[in-house]
Amino acid sequence: PDFDGGLGFLFKWNMGWMNDTLRYFQQDPLYRKYQHNLLTFTMSYAFSENYILPLSHDEVVYGKGSLMGKMPGDYFWKFANLRLLRGYQVANPGKKLSFMGNEFGQFTEWDYRKELDWMLLGYEMHQKMQSYTRELNRFYLNHAALWQIDDSWDGYQWIQPDEQDLSIIAFRRIDKAGRELLVICNFTPVLREDLRLGVPKPGTYVPVFTSDAAKFGGGGYGSAPAESEEIPFREYALSAMFRVPPMSIT
């Protein structure tokens, strides 16, 4: 920044986050547990700069394929992975950048010589992907916990960083008023019926958003409210049992 003797740049692209995240998502979910550190390592330096989390044009050109093309699985699971990726980006601390075409799931990489493949919006799954992006952006704007404290641990706390065997992570996002969101990411196509996680406060934890919703093209498994219990989990005195849809962020 100029006030610190610099040239006036206030943000830096987090290329480490981008490289590690895309490398992780390109893995077959069966083997993601062996690459779990790609998810957690980025938080070791997340607050060393004012970062932007980029899913930019540079990753969808020159034979690299589109974001959708990088996702493993069949047609259904490619969309599930892409929704999870976009939600994971939004839930992590740092400002967001996403290149055009990502919002509706373009299959071909970007070609500067022609327009985007808008005809894909004639297909239901691409319409639902676009709707997901719209509602995800609105959810982000309406919940200050996701953007108000992006530069310190005051706005982010781990709940479960190392459940590598299940390929699950969970964390808290916190705003300046102390309001919180509890975020659970399931990086496998397996429904987790009774996942115990630590919780910071007593009460009922009610699902407010999930990428698995049927209206977004997901399986529509749903997540029931979870009641806290006086059962310690890791550093938390309380915990709760959560129902976590497959390949989703909730």
Model region roles, listed by residue range:
Residues D28-M68, N92:
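Aromatic-lined glycan-binding groove of carbohydrate-active enzymes
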Residues R32-Y34, G63-K64, G73-S98, N102-T250:
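Carbohydrate-interacting/catalytic domains
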